[in-house]
Amino acid sequence: MPSNSGDDNVLQVLIKNFDVLALPLVTLVYPLYASVKAIETRSLPEDEQWLTYWVLYALISLFELTFSKPLEWFPIWPYMKLFGICWLVLPQFNGAEHIYKHFIRPFYRDPQRATTKIWYVPHKKFNFFPKRDDDDILTAAEKYMEQHGTEAFERMIVKKDSYERGRSSRGINNHMIFDDDYRY
């Protein structure tokens, strides 16, 4: 005869609400403890790990706030979030560094190029019957000259060259303060 003791009920409640119990521990309590520990030890790699984690946690929170209604339709979302944040938090996986290095940092360093990469769809890969073998830049230049004329194209090039020469003579550069050999 199966027993219906209080211990079995508590265990069932814990299992059913695992995500509700584990999520605050994994997302807030452990990272908070590890962040304070990193500050106290003055370890640069640990500081970087936890700063990147908090940046990503803020982005995840913004995503959840923005899409809270559609996320209610996905009952697996809390488990996916728990799994993903475990990957970000645990230093063995170094997930926060990976995501920051490959997705956030390129966007931060050059937002225009990063968004262009996201929305750029090369026509050659999807066009089974290409009309010409020219590069996309050459095609765009030809279209511009057809629409606006060669004189407008030449003026645009001269304007760009004079702008670049003016910037270089004034010593102005458009580089971020981070070097390319920076850890992240």
UniProtKB/Swiss-Prot annotation:
Location of the protein in the cell: Membrane
Entries under Pfam families matching the protein: TB2_DP1_HVA22
Expression sites (tissue/organ): Predominantly expressed in flower buds and stem.
Keyword terms of this UniProt record: Membrane, Transmembrane, Transmembrane helix
Membrane topology: Multi-pass membrane protein
Assigned GO CC terms: membrane; plasmodesma
Primary location class: membrane
TM helices/strands, residue ranges: 13-33, 51-71, 73-93
Matching InterPro entries: TB2_DP1_HVA22
Any GO BP annotation: response to water deprivation
Family according to the record: Belongs to the DP1 family.
Protein name (Swiss-Prot/TrEMBL): HVA22-like protein c
Gene source species: Arabidopsis thaliana (Mouse-ear cress)
Lineage: Eukaryota, Viridiplantae, Streptophyta, Embryophyta, Tracheophyta
Gene (UniProt): HVA22C
